[in-house]
Amino acid sequence: MNFNINILGTGGTRPLHNRYLTSVLIEYHGESFLFDCGEATQMSLRKQKISWQKIKVICITHLHADHITGLLGIVMLMAQSGDTRKEPLTIIGPIGIKKYLDANIELLRVHKNYDIIYKEIIINKTEPILYEDKKKRIEYIKLKHSIECVGYLFIEKDKPGKFNTQKAESLNIPKGPIRKTLQEGHEVILNGKKILPSEILGESQKGLKFAYITDTAYFEELSTHIKNFNLVIIESTFKNDLKDEAKKKLHLTAKLAAKITKKANVYQTGLIHFSERYTLNKDLCELLDEAQQEYPNGEIFLTKDGMRLKANKDKFIIK
């Protein structure tokens, strides 16, 4: 299965020497989708030997510096790597993302040899589905932060079951476009008779569901958007002893992050966006322990810079 999740950075506020700012990149069947792009994100791409030219869509959660200041560098990098990029780059984010990037491009006279397609989100007005093709879609959900902020859902569509050749032959379905249409999950009319995909396909395989959630305060409704997701990468900025500060700054503690995914019956929870005050392994282990105590039956782990997760059936395996 060609579905990988790369952790480019796990920190908040500013990059540290061993922890870049929070950013996640999905590789899906030869295409890449980048979520947030803080300062030094391109350094993470280089370190992990990930091609920036394969990035098809960049999704920005909100317009705070630690989630956006690396965006111009990525745009320049794509242009400076020769004329190899042919397709446009889609950039998705809250209102203001276009103004921010266009102003920087104009002021710095950035040369780019490809088009940028902007999709600005007007929360509660923009339709939830932002991107869609035959295999997947990207949706947004409203979060609760000091400025407009969204989380992103990357949803793989269910895959049709195995094609039963013997059954197809017994129904006199010819090889070619008609069989392909059925394999893609669409009904056909053959000799005046309707044939359903279920007649010649085995049981369909459920697509994987992934969510990227940062920065946000706790609110009850959040869990409803990620019900039964396979993997949720969610901010865990503070330990529980700073829960009042988390509430004031509209962030989550590790305990609250686990409470959200527990309520949603999430299969795997990855903690991310750690406060810069937590530089010791001991501190991070305490974050993890607090989350695991809240959701003892869930699979919870600390994300790390450079971590790569590979899809395997209904879960993701750390490589």
Curated annotation (Swiss-Prot):
The record's Gene3D superfamilies line, in alphabetical order, gives: Ribonuclease Z/Hydroxyacylglutathione hydrolase-like
Please name the GO terms that the record assigns under molecular function: 3'-tRNA processing endoribonuclease activity; zinc ion binding
Q: List the disulfide bonds.
A: none
> What domain of life?
Bacteria
Q: CDD domains under this entry?
A: RNaseZ_ZiPD-like_MBL-fold (cd07717)
Q: Known Pfam families for this protein?
A: Lactamase_B, Lactamase_B_2
Q: Which residues bind Zn(2+) 1?
A: H62, H64, H145, D215
User: Where along the chain is Zn(2+) 2 bound?
Assistant: D66, H67, D215, H273
Recorded catalytic activity of this chain's protein: Endonucleolytic cleavage of RNA, removing extra 3' nucleotides from tRNA precursor, generating 3' termini of tRNAs. A 3'-hydroxy group is left at the tRNA terminus and a 5'-phosphoryl group is left at the trailer molecule
* EC nos: 3.1.26.11
Active site annotation, chain numbering: D66 (proton acceptor)
Relate the assembly described in the record.
Homodimer.
**Family designation:** Belongs to the RNase Z family.
Return the NCBIfam families for the record: PRK00055.1-3, RNase_Z
Name used for this protein in its record: Ribonuclease Z
